[in-house]
Amino acid sequence: MAEVKIPQATAKRLPIYYRYLRLLSNSGKNRVSSTELAEAVKVDSATIRRDFSYFGALGKRGYGYDVQSLLDFFTKQLNQDTLTNVALVGVGNLGHALLNFNFHQSNHVRISAAFDVNEDITGTIQSGIPVYPMSDMKEQLKLQQIEIVILTVPAPVAQKVTDELVEVGVRGILNFTPLRITVPENIRVQNVDLTNEMETLIYFLNHFGSTEE
């Protein structure tokens, strides 16, 4: 099957569908309707049908979707059968929390290396992950063929570290810093600003009540 170009909004929903389908499969359920799926993942059924339509005929009218077939399909789409090693750059409080988390609910993503300037933790194993000094970052990323990095360094050094990641060939950055880093067009950045998300939540609660967006 040729690579399918889909809207970014649809792409963001695919992991949500996958996780719920995996729950259904583990519980022994054989089929699911778009209405049932919509109620579970809080996405309206019309949107689900439109999302699925980008990939062709995934279900049957009057029958719904075969859970295992759909799960197998999204497993391939999301590369769930391939292990992706990622690196963590910045092992402060948030970095430590992410090392402890280490995508335990995912079968295909794993933090395999971490980097920091703190000599008290470099050269040690934290939550099962080796922590290297920043001076070893480029060498280790190349050696371990890591192309995706989680960035949790202080904001003042975020762009400098990003530039080094670009030089070594990193293709994707999950950016937890408040700085909107600058990268070439061929590099994908996902920004996760916890402070901004909390302030947005407080604003909506104060002005619109508790209705979900």
UniProtKB/Swiss-Prot annotation:
Which GO terms fall under biological process for this protein?
Answer: negative regulation of DNA-templated transcription; response to redox state
**Entry annotated with the keyword Manganese:** no
Keywords attached to this entry: Cytoplasm, DNA-binding, NAD, Repressor, Transcription, Transcription regulation
Q: Name one GO cellular component term.
A: cytoplasm
Residues binding NAD(+), per UniProt? 90-95
* InterPro entries, alphabetized: CoA-bd, NAD(P)-bd_dom_sf, Rex_DNA-bd_C_dom, Tscrpt_rep_Rex, WH-like_DNA-bd_sf, WH_DNA-bd_sf
Q: Which SMART domains match?
A: CoA_binding
SUPFAM superfamilies reported for this sequence = NAD(P)-binding Rossmann-fold domains, Winged helix' DNA-binding domain
- Cited PANTHER family: REDOX-SENSING TRANSCRIPTIONAL REPRESSOR REX, REDOX-SENSING TRANSCRIPTIONAL REPRESSOR REX 1
Q: Indicate the family of this protein.
A: Belongs to the transcriptional regulatory Rex family.
Q: What is this protein called?
A: Redox-sensing transcriptional repressor Rex
Q: Which organism is it from?
A: Ligilactobacillus salivarius (strain UCC118) (Lactobacillus salivarius)
